[in-house]
Amino acid sequence: KEDSCQLGYSQGPCLGMFKRYFYNGTSMACETFYYGGCMGNGNNFPSEKECLQTCRTVQACNLPIVRGPCRAGIELWAFDAVKGKCVRFIYGGCNGNGNQFYSQKECKEYCGIPGEADEELLR
């Protein structure tokens, strides 16, 4: 994974208040912070989606499916470890974790059972 994902967030010395996302390796989630607008480091993303797609690891597949307390009603995909497959869920838009994907294909690529796609080609 990108080395910058392992860094903590950095607001930088400037005084802007730009809402950005950084990857928190401990919680395996992308969290918000306010970026000053200059310097900082590479663990700084304009969207939660870009942050997750850059920094998430396969361990995210073992995390619980978290709707979060907000009420945005975004349809996403997550890996259900009990069912062993990717399922749809409604994400509230905040305080989620790395087990959220923007398409079934993306979820399967990260968390799918190895060889599943190959077997479909043989049928």
Curated annotation (Swiss-Prot):
List residue numbers at the site (Reactive bond for chymotrypsin and elastase). Answer: L15, G16
| GO annotation, cellular component aspect | extracellular region
Q: Where is this site: Reactive bond for trypsin?
A: R71, A72
Database matches in Pfam families: Kunitz_BPTI
Entry keywords, A to Z: Disulfide bond, Glycoprotein, Protease inhibitor, Repeat, Secreted, Serine protease inhibitor
Glycosylated residues (UniProt): N24
Its localization reads: Secreted
List, alphabetically, the SMART domains matched: KU (SM00131)
Record domain BPTI/Kunitz inhibitor: where: 5-55, 61-111
Intrachain S-S bonds:
C5-C55, C14-C38, C30-C51, C61-C111, C70-C94, C86-C107
What the entry lists under InterPro entries is as follows: AMBP, Kunitz_BPTI, Kunitz_BPTI_sf, Prtase_inh_Kunz-CS
What's an example of a GO molecular-function annotation for this chain?
serine-type endopeptidase inhibitor activity
Asked if the Swiss-Prot or TrEMBL record annotates the protein with the keyword Membrane, the reply is: no
What is the role of the protein in this entry? This inhibitory fragment, released from native ITI after limited proteolysis with trypsin, contains two homologous domains. Whereas the second domain is a strong inhibitor of trypsin, the first domain interacts weakly with PMN-granulocytic elastase and not at all with pancreatic elastase.
Question: Any miscellaneous information on file?
Answer: The amino acid at position p2' (17) appears to determine the specificity of the inhibition of domain I. Inhibitors with methionine in this position interact weakly with chymotrypsin and elastase; those with leucine interact strongly.
The record ties this protein, via PANTHER family, to:
PROTEIN AMBP (PTHR46676:SF1)
Q: What is this protein called?
A: Inter-alpha-trypsin inhibitor
Question: Origin organism of this chain?
Answer: Capra hircus
